[in-house]
Amino acid sequence: MVDKREEVMHVAMFPWLAMGHLLPFLRLSKLLAQKGHKISFISTPRNIERLPKLQSNLASSITFVSFPLPPISGLPPSSESSMDVPYNKQQSLKAAFDLLQPPLKEFLRRSSPDWIIYDYASHWLPSIAAELGISKAFFSLFNAATLCFMGPSSSLIEEIRSTPEDFTVVPPWVPFKSNIVFRYHEVTRYVEKTEEDVTGVSDSVRFGYSIDESDAVFVRSCPEFEPEWFGLLKDLYRKPVFPIGFLPPVIEDDDAVDTTWVRIKKWLDKQRLNSVVYVSLGTEASLRHEEVTELALGLEKSETPFFWVLRNEPKIPDGFKTRVKGRGMVHVGWVPQVKILSHESVGGFLTHCGWNSVVEGLGFGKVPIFFPVLNEQGLNTRLLHGKGLGVEVSRDERDGSFDSDSVADSIRLVMIDDAGEEIRAKAKVMKDLFGNMDENIRYVDELVRFMRSKGSSSSS
């Protein structure tokens, strides 16, 4: 009889169609594969092509399973990721995603994995897994504080909060003092997203069923960082909740020459140690023209070196590039963010505060400057700011407007002013927590022990 502690598991991974979800799922896949387990990573053709190439020692352990995304009305051709469609088309992408149920069910029936680890959008998956006798875990890319703010699965399914004001106060199930709430201008976007759209199912309901019908919940964080929130989360969910650590960023060797990185590195190499502010607001957010203008003028006024990444070509102020030439670099399109954040000349990170970016930035000890734009980013900002980690750009509470002075002041505080010394020191301390690979591996080891003890009886 094979010892359960030595048994090789077959684990299927099914992330939502966004790079900010695909990459952490792949990171966890690699860590499980390094422990000797077999992984089936399921997504669409274009998303799989976008993923970084596997190291040769993992190629035999991770199999990419590709399902074409069914075409639907309202979704532009070749749109397979949230980065391919505007914000107001996200629900159309989910409608196409929901049509993957038949091929996914057939694959699971044929391959009989021991576990399937899934994302929030596939609320229909747990019932399929249960029918096939496959153990199922919801992998949350949100931290424990955000999950607690969202509440127990029943509150999500019943959608008990519906107005912006409902989201700007601490919910009744949080029994201790908390600053984890949305600002009004943040929540107006969030509440819009909870409404039913072309799929007939809101994001709130998707989350609720994904949590409620799971056998366990895996969380990309750890109790050392948010102890009170993990304790509350276990009370709210009443099922196994496992921290998996931060899945810290790793710079992998790549034989291919990355011409984009070569050009960026050449510029960064010329800058002083910890002098550069890296500016990136994610792949999904689209800033209005006036916001781009104020952000640009704020970077100019800060008199600090900066590297600014934009997803598409915006209209920046006339003469801006000329005035900041040599001190600032503007790049349109994809960049190797982990490599940039690892560079010694980068000291600060003006970020939308998506959890992936938070982990990557603090994993290298970079000081965050918060500019939340969408989704749970405001909650992440409150969590970090409450711990003295970083500075938030001042904005109008109602409409989210800001001016160039608030941008410049935030940058100078983090990068130059004596008053920011404590903030800079705390970010460096966080590097030992967010970037500690050994400590994070310990959480993955505990996760594997649990999965082995609870997995299905299907063959590997």
Curated annotation (Swiss-Prot):
This is UDP-glycosyltransferase 91C1. It holds the Pfam family UDPGT. It comes from Arabidopsis thaliana. Belongs to the UDP-glycosyltransferase family. Transmembrane segments: none annotated. GO terms for molecular function: UDP-glucosyltransferase activity; UDP-glycosyltransferase activity. Keywords: Glycosyltransferase, Transferase. UDP-alpha-D-glucose binds at residues 283, 335-337, 352-360, 374-377. The keyword Transferase applies. Its EC number is 2.4.1.-. InterPro entries: UDP-glycosyltransf_plant, UDP_glucos_trans. It is an enzyme of class 2 (transferase).
